Amino acid sequence: MKSLAGHVVKYGKHRERRSFARISEVLELPNLIEIQTDSYQWFLDEGLREMFEDILPIDDFNGNLSLEFVDYELKEPKYTVAEARAHDANYSAPLHVTLRLTNRETGEIKAQEVFFGDFPLMTEQGTFIINGAERVIVSQLVRSPGVYFHGKVDKNGKEGFGSTVIPNRGAWLEMETDAKDISYVRIDRTRKIPLTVLVRALGFGSDDTIFEIFGDSETLRNTVEKDLHKNASDSRTEEGLKDVYERLRPGEPKTADSSRNLLNARFFDPKRYDLANVGRYKVNKKLDLKTRLLNLTLAETLVDPETGEIIVEKGTVLTHQVMETLAPFIDNGLNSGTYYPSEDGVVTDPMTVQVIKVFSPRDPEREVNVIGNGYPEAAVKTVRPADIIASMSYFLNLMEGIGNVDDIDHLGNRRIRSVGELLQNQFRIGLARMERVVRERMSIQDTETLTPQQLINIRPVVASIKEFFGSSQLSQFMDQTNPLGELTHKRRLSALGPGGLTRDRAGYEVRDVHYSHYGRMCPIETPEGPNIGLINSLSSYAKVNKFGFIETPYRRVDRETGRVTDQIDYLTADIEDHYIVAQANSPLNEDGTFAQDVVMARAQSENLEVSIDKVDYMDVSPKQVVAVATACIPFLENDDSNRALMGANMQRQAVPLINPQAPWVGTGMEYKSAHDSGAALLCKHDGVVEYVDASEIRVRRDNGALDKYDVTKFRRSNSGTSYNQRPIVHLGEKVEKGVTLADGPSMEQGEMALGQNVLVGFMTWEGYNYEDAIIMSRRLVKDDVYTSIHIEEYESEARDTKLGPEEITREIPNVGEDALKDLDEMGIIRIGAEVQDGDLLVGKVTPKGVTELSAEERLLHAIFGEKAREVRDTSLRVPHGGGGIVHDVKIFTREAGDELSPGVNMLVRVYIVQKRKIHEGDKMAGRHGNKGVVSRIMPEEDMPFLPDGTPIDIMLNPLGVPSRMNIGQVLELHLGMAARQLGIHVATPVFDGASDEDVWETVREAGMASDAKTVLYDGRTGEPFDGRVSVGVMYMIKLAHMVDDKLHARSIGPYSLVTQQPLGGKAQFGGQRFGEMEVWALEAYGAAYTLQEILTYKSDDVVGRVKTYEAIVKGEPIPKPGVPESFRVLVKELQSLGLDMRVLDIEETEIELRDMDDEDDDLITVDALTKFAEQQTAKELEKKAAEQVEDEKDDVIQNFETAEDNLD
């Protein structure tokens, strides 16, 4: 095998890397978001049509009217993607459906196009825009419909078996054995009934028929004995039907008819029971005779029914070779038998099954019937009697040692529900609700004038779609911290959600890594915490097939020549189980044959050394095992998996920096992940760049047309980071389709660039890097190396209140002119203003609550005219820690035609941008799970420096490496230093990257010392440190956990309503909880006064804290504390239990507790006239202090008539 190590590879148009890969790429990575886009496209092309054809035609109860589906069409969307974002609207297109209403009595046909609501569209990036925010529909991992068998051991240690037929929707059918070897069935988790009762109910009533179908077995005999004929007046079938009905509907009068209808509806009605395509495929596959007969001994001679030729003799062992001969005959229905159920059974159609007799492996003398389901068509979506009989046969055969049990955690038994299918299921719910309405309207309205439009009520359909996008567990606000987070979110697989698991019920087995995950689901990338193993990520090469099973690609090995071909087969997990797969790093000769006689290979869960003539397939690439984020970790093979998990997860939390750098030591995944993430601006057609500036790129296509591309500038992302694109093409450059025209956030030259390449030394310094803390040079602050831009959005809306409309204005009560200096004439902050915490952004006043006016007040108001009502200041101010520069202001009003929610007259959005430099307390990390908090930022001159005088940037604690076992960071450090010296970028792909030799070879080439260490000098004294230190370049990222977001202090603030104690948490401007253990600490020190003030003034002594506040303001001594509110709550609780409890002081005089009624001052009535007079005088006195009003009575009498008119 030729070594490719050290060759140069081009990534995109602008970046070359020296790659250490030894294995050539046979297959390019697929489009990484196709799991989203392909699934949605399927839904638009086929899924919607399938839905309409399932539900329609709808017939009325008499069968006179029929509403049929003709066609559907999605019209042009109302808004573009950018407009939908700006207007807080949905990016959606109106769905129009053509329906035909046929009146069978008159033969009249009416066709009409009906509007079916706006249907959300997927953007090119694989997201949806709902209410202006980008959302992602996460794919769900669920158990596939099908028939499953499992072993179980009872409390006495006796082995038994169980079986479950799981539909896509409908009733479950379970079978189990008990300690007495009797077989039972349960329908939909109800009480169990003997297995033969269900067989009789299906129409095979007599014992003889049952033994004829299933053959003789001990379990079956025990079950038949248990199932006695109790009522001689009923036939066995009718009795079976009644027994089933009794279990399903206990307490209701049982008749054979009602039971027949019930069973028909439960299993054989396509509207109520649906196996789906995948269920039918799985059932046929499991009950297929070809796999079940393998390695058994025939108990009958098999004859070709057409020619009478003997195919296989009795007593033959059915090996692979024999089965190859037999397979075509089995497929053509060999040994099919037709059984006719009795007239009173559930299904009266004849049942065809295939029965082949074999000898039992447990008792070689005894014959056993193996029953196949006769291969129903793929179109049969319900379960059929033949399926039930064949699955019972499989279940009974298990006791004879024939067949095998299933592993429910195997990816052959778990499938993906992607966007398209999830939407389809939701749409079905809406259509089913609509169907009920249509039926009712058909019977009520006049058939002569009826049109499809009058029948249809689209509300349930619209509501179900809205509910799905708005509040489903799988519709998530997109993680947009950086492009890698975006990409990973779209490729996420969740086992939670409707129809899935719940966190509490999910055991260890479901969460564990399974051998079938290889190449399908990443064994590393999953969250830490309660969701571990329930939320996974799709592996880099994996695809989802039409049944929803994950497939992974393998290179086919030509068995005859022993050559590994370039032909790629995508295999699902259950098909892969039949093959032996060699690893991607197996050495090959020039002609593609294996270089060694024995290779490492996988056969199901085993890793074996096998001879090359047994190998069927070979892995495509070493990185097909892992997900995209994991594949971005260089030297992954040298890291412990727990740390690699943290490394993969933390890359998603990297904050986009002002001028990011792609890593010098990469893995070669940087370009592809950035290209497919949706954050880069990609060229749609070949052409030449005709114009380029910061906000627009124009490309002249080869056919002469002009394409315009808008470059996004400083848009707020979902997570409050700056989403900014910058062009990387130049004027006159020739560009091809799919080339990156502009970098998105966290990208450089088309590659993912989450952090910076910094000079790192592994050394301790004065204890400042204790417990993984990071010491940093001030250069990184000064040169804006780790500076990021954050944009926060604040909004204020003017609503209609009961007391009148709120008003956005500059005139705000009790606010000085200084505070209004940056507001415009409307009272809205100007763009570019620098604001601090507490500054005004939008001036707004709300009418003050005036209590209901009495008759006299209304009269006086009418006489003297409406005076200016009192208003409250409800302006929007900058919250704590939110200061910055006003980046943009958006104003939405009804007059301008903007859609606002009811009761809102005006909406103002203010965007404030912050430039955050790196800070002590910020969290940083490498790519190997090596995270820490910046503990000290030191002057550049105090940092240790290299012999050439270069000060290092960061000091990490060497003790963070050995116990964590992430040695990859040390290798990255050395290779990074060599790359820096040589001025090159390198790629070291996962599991196929630079070996130890490669690293040391590159170190030598760069002219570094043989151990890659160096002498460091103390920046303060200039003396060299004792030992040589590992210094090199490491890629470090700044994470979204920034100290500015967490810093919080409270003086006084809001209190809880009931307990009157301070609230908690930064969002509520709350306090720090002083809990039980903290109280013990103060008690232990005997700090009585400190303890007293913490439990009273600082907590819930309502009166005391107000008096204390006043005392501090006036500079008086602090008064004695009162009774805490929580004590009053306790007293009231005891009083409510009927205990007369009072509080006495030392002198045994009762202490009055604050009563709730004291607060309700509003309830005290005031004489209406005096109240009105007080309101009036304040204004009157200012204007007419000199004038005296004489003879008010005369005025009142004169104005009486006017008053009456006004009141009317």
From Swiss-Prot:
Q: What PROSITE patterns does its record include?
A: RNA_POL_BETA
What is the source species? Answer: Enterococcus faecium
**What does the function comment of this entry state?**
DNA-dependent RNA polymerase catalyzes the transcription of DNA into RNA using the four ribonucleoside triphosphates as substrates.
Q: Name one GO cellular component term.
A: DNA-directed RNA polymerase complex
Tell me the protein's name.
Answer: DNA-directed RNA polymerase subunit beta
Q: Which InterPro entries does the UniProt record give?
A: DNA-dir_RNA_pol_bsu_ext_1_sf (IPR042107), DNA-dir_RNA_pol_bsu_external_1 (IPR019462), DNA-dir_RNA_pol_su2 (IPR015712), DNA-dir_RNAP_su2_dom (IPR007120), DNA-dir_RNAP_su2_hyb_sf (IPR037033), RNA_pol_bsu_bac (IPR010243), RNA_pol_bsu_CS (IPR007121), RNA_pol_bsu_protrusion (IPR007644)
Q: What is the lineage of its organism?
A: Bacteria, Bacillati, Bacillota, Bacilli, Lactobacillales
Pfam families found in the cross-reference section: RNA_pol_Rpb2_1, RNA_pol_Rpb2_2, RNA_pol_Rpb2_3, RNA_pol_Rpb2_45, RNA_pol_Rpb2_6, RNA_pol_Rpb2_7
- Record-linked HAMAP family: RNApol_bact_RpoB
GO molecular function terms attached to this record: DNA binding; DNA-directed RNA polymerase activity; ribonucleoside binding
